[in-house]
């Protein structure tokens, strides 16, 4: 599926700010895919990526994981091993409101990644967090089951499939 977020904004202009929302530009681009899209699965965690491994262990075909890591810049929520697992299980991409690590390796993996930045330190492993709850960051609420579109120009969230 090919798309451009500017074209989607133009095509669905009357729905902008309603069913189609533009995420505040704040993310760095990583991973081997410059663009990705899919149905949203969410995690709300803080400096503990135990649930990320669990979710990436599931079938991710046609899905994007949105991680609300509280915007923490103190550790990385996704590293190369989790990106490899996500790719193996068919995930389209991941948006991390937090940091990743092993960015050089992740850039060679066929998965789309957006994150605030990088950090070399791993997280705690306590198994704490929530799955498939509405999360809000970047001026947008991400609801499980909605759709996310990301490319070089930005990230969009929509209540319905746009392509």
Swiss-Prot record:
Cofactor binding note of this UniProt entry: Divalent metal cation.
Protein name: Putative 4-hydroxy-4-methyl-2-oxoglutarate aldolase
Family listed: Belongs to the class II aldolase/RraA-like family.
Entry keyword set: Lyase, Metal-binding
Binding site for substrate: 79-82, 101
SUPFAM superfamilies: RraA-like (SSF89562)
BP-aspect Gene Ontology terms: regulation of RNA metabolic process
Organism, as annotated: Dechloromonas aromatica (strain RCB)
Species lineage: Bacteria, Pseudomonadati, Pseudomonadota, Betaproteobacteria, Rhodocyclales
One Pfam short name: RraA-like
Complexes and interactors: Homotrimer.
Enzyme Commission number(s) from the entry: 4.1.3.17, 4.1.1.112
GO molecular function, one term: 4-hydroxy-4-methyl-2-oxoglutarate aldolase activity
Leading EC class: lyase
Sequence positions that bind a divalent metal cation: 102
Cofactor(s) required for function per UniProt: a divalent metal cation
Catalytic activity entry: 4-hydroxy-4-methyl-2-oxoglutarate = 2 pyruvate; oxaloacetate + H(+) = pyruvate + CO2
Keyword Oxidoreductase: no
